[in-house]
Amino acid sequence: MSKEDSKQTLRAQMQEELQGLDPEERRGRSLQICNHVLELPVWKQARVVVVFEPFKHEPEITPLISDLQRRGSEIIAILPTARSQHDVAIFGPIDLVLVPGIAFTRNGARMGRGFGFFDRFLAHRAIAAIKIGIAFRFQIVESLPLESHDVKLDLVVTD
């Protein structure tokens, strides 16, 4: 099986698991993830944070956005309609990036949603920022078929 076939198979398996998650369980698990992030020293110190708009079955991050608003942090939202790095204009340093994905490893490897946007964004725009993957526990796998351009995350937070 080719690397691309492996990625597509894993992506399909994870999508099925994400879609099978009961909405109430998704909310509860999302809250656990957010609570773990809120306890991180790097989160508490971050002043400029890139967030993502979760797709329907991904972890919900509204409590994190609320915390940033309460603290007066600058929030940069990456929307699903942004298909290229040129769709996002950021002028200045970024402290932290919350990163969505389909699958992750414990050592920071990530398989994205399949569009390549976050990979390009992380490679070109947020090199010095702390990169945190946001995932449900079942999205953690032993290994991923990676490409040379894939950017490792500093941390992956789960429920």
Can you say where each PLM-predicted feature lies in the sequence?
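Conserved phosphate- and dinucleotide-binding cores of soluble alpha/beta proteins
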Residues: 83-159
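N-terminal active-site beta-alpha-beta segment that forms phosphate/nucleotide-binding
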Residues: 2-93
